[in-house]
Regions:
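Amphipathic alpha-helical protein-interaction segments enriched in hydrophobic
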Residues: 222-232, 236
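A solvent-exposed, charged loop/short amphipathic helix patch at secondary-structure junctions
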Residues: 247-267
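Polar, glycine-rich mid-to-C-terminal structural blocks
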Residues: 239-241, 270-284
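Conserved, well-structured interaction surfaces
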Residues: 45, 50, 58-68, 88-168, ...
């Protein structure tokens, strides 16, 4: 009898041990997967908010292998002085062959990336962030931190657009969220004239240079600084003042469908003065 009772006790305990994990996992199973979170749930949580911000940062290029180098090999690969054997294509140099053979397309500016498409994706993500991010006191997301986040995103949007301007010239400048349910006429925005884009980015960089810090501690290194704003602004204004974009008659026929010219045909020497002042501001 005692042996039977002991055996029954052991069986009962084993069943209990087997069932406990099932009940303890109920809360876990009730949780919504990260990839199924609503946008409200994201911005109600400080950690998810930071993850969204990190996603906006995601298009910032590697300075060695991407932005400073064309196709990872240097802008000089587009020059007439550079030649290569077709047999080198098997070693990953195929992109350079595309350049030399005239089969290079705007979507191949950066290998493995579609800069045009990805820029608009990140800009939209940034605009959503600016609209949704908020203070969460019980999660230590303060008003001050929210403002810092917003300024970082504003910089990133301006920075991404400055890259677009450098690579493509005029493009549709979108500064507010567009509703996907809008009509095709609204969504198919025409390209914005070059000088209009420059003026917008000029104002953004200048304003942010007065807000963003000059440096960060090691924990936050890599975030945008006032110096970065001034440097990008000076570089952009220098190109805008150059003969390439300042009254270049070669672009006189580059217009939108409604006839709006995308490049000014009037040479303006004041652009050089503005560029010089901007460069001096960086040095000082």
């Amino acid at each position: 009898m005692k042996k039977y009772t002991y055996k029954k006790y052991i069986q009962t305990m084993m069943l209990a041990v087997a069932v406990i994990p099932f009940f303890s996992s109920c809360d876990y199973l009730d949780k919504e997967p990260d990839d199924m979170l609503t946008i409200d749930a994201v911005f109600d949580n400080a950690d998810y908010t930071k993850q969204w911000l990190a996603g906006v940062y995601n298009l910032v290029p590697d300075p060695l292998w991407e932005y400073m180098n064309f196709a990872g090999y240097g802008y000089y690969m587009m020059s007439d002085e550079t030649q290569m054997a077709s047999s080198l294509g098997q070693f990953g140099w195929g992109n350079l062959m595309n350049v030399q053979q005239g089969s290079w397309t705007p979507t191949q500016i950066i290998p493995g990336k579609n800069l045009w498409k990805e820029t608009y994706q990140k800009v939209r993500s940034g605009l959503i962030f600016l609209e949704r991010v908020k203070e969460i006191p019980d999660q230590r997301q303060t008003v001050e931190l929210v403002e810092r986040y917003k300024n970082e995103v504003r910089f990133l949007i301006a920075y991404y657009y400055s890259r677009m301007l450098e690579v493509y010239g005029p493009f549709p400048l979108i500064t507010s969220l567009m509703d996907v349910n809008d009509s095709g006429e609204v969504l198919k925005k025409e390209r914005t004239p070059y000088d209009e884009i420059v003026n917008y980015l000029d104002n953004e960089f200048m304003e942010l240079s007065k807000i963003l810090p000059s440096s960060y501690d090691n924990v936050n290194i890599g975030r945008p600084t006032s110096g970065a704003c001034l440097a990008l602004r000076a570089r952009m204004l220098m190109f805008a003042a150059s003969p390439l974009f300042n009254g270049n008659e070669d672009f006189k026929d580059v217009v939108n469908k409604d006839g709006t010219p995308l490049f000014s045909q009037s040479k303006d020497n004041k652009k050089w003065e503005k560029a010089a002042v901007a460069a001096k501001l960086v040095i000082d």
